[in-house]
Amino acid sequence: MAEDRFPGWHGTTILAVRRGGEVVVAGDGQVSLGQTVIKGTARKVRRLSPGGHEVVAGFAGSTADAFTLLERLEKKLEAASGQLARACVELAKDWRMDKYLRNLEAMLIVTDGETLLVITGAGDVLEPEHDVTAIGSGGNFALAAARGLMATDLPAEEVARKAMAIAADICVYTNGNLTVERISK
């Protein structure tokens, strides 16, 4: 993703876990340039409230591109009266049709506490099969760990924190400085 345009930039692991009537979204704080950590406390998980409809979003890829997408998502949510899936599909349509948006290099995980979706860099909207999804440089590590931890009785936040710790131990572009947001319907 962002690595295509800026070969040396790396960073971000975002994980979402749905369990027990809530969704927890966790993101690490590391941004790296090559072998150098530029920032260890970046905040890549945000709470949005367009029109009073609460949504939590985590992003990976280009930060400027992600903020552009988050702004557009907020507008789509207002227009869709808070219907997250509809707003995301409309955003994806724009992403695919608009010349400017097609060049954006970011991915999003979004949830309203019930619906959990990934919006890919290609403009696809995906719903995870196993109540767990992840994006970013350490996403596969976090996803594998979280799927294994879902076999336990741990609450969603603990699954997310433990899985992110495992990802941070494996992925050099992921740290243990987490931002965690919880949302339920």
Swiss-Prot record:
One of its GO terms (cellular component) is proteasome core complex. This is ATP-dependent protease subunit HslV. SUPFAM superfamilies: N-terminal nucleophile aminohydrolases (Ntn hydrolases). The keyword Cytoplasm applies. It holds the Pfam family Proteasome. A double ring-shaped homohexamer of HslV is capped on each side by a ring-shaped HslU homohexamer. The assembly of the HslU/HslV complex is dependent on binding of ATP. It is found in: Cytoplasm. It catalyses: ATP-dependent cleavage of peptide bonds with broad specificity. Na(+) binds at residues 168, 171, 174. Keywords: Allosteric enzyme, Cytoplasm, Hydrolase, Metal-binding, Protease, Sodium, Threonine protease. Belongs to the peptidase T1B family. HslV subfamily. The gene is hslV. The active site is at residue 12. It comes from Cereibacter sphaeroides (strain ATCC 17025 / ATH 2.4.3). HAMAP family: HslV. Its EC number is 3.4.25.2. Protease subunit of a proteasome-like degradation complex believed to be a general protein degrading machinery. One of its GO terms (molecular function) is metal ion binding. Allosterically activated by HslU binding. One of its GO terms (biological process) is proteolysis involved in protein catabolic process.
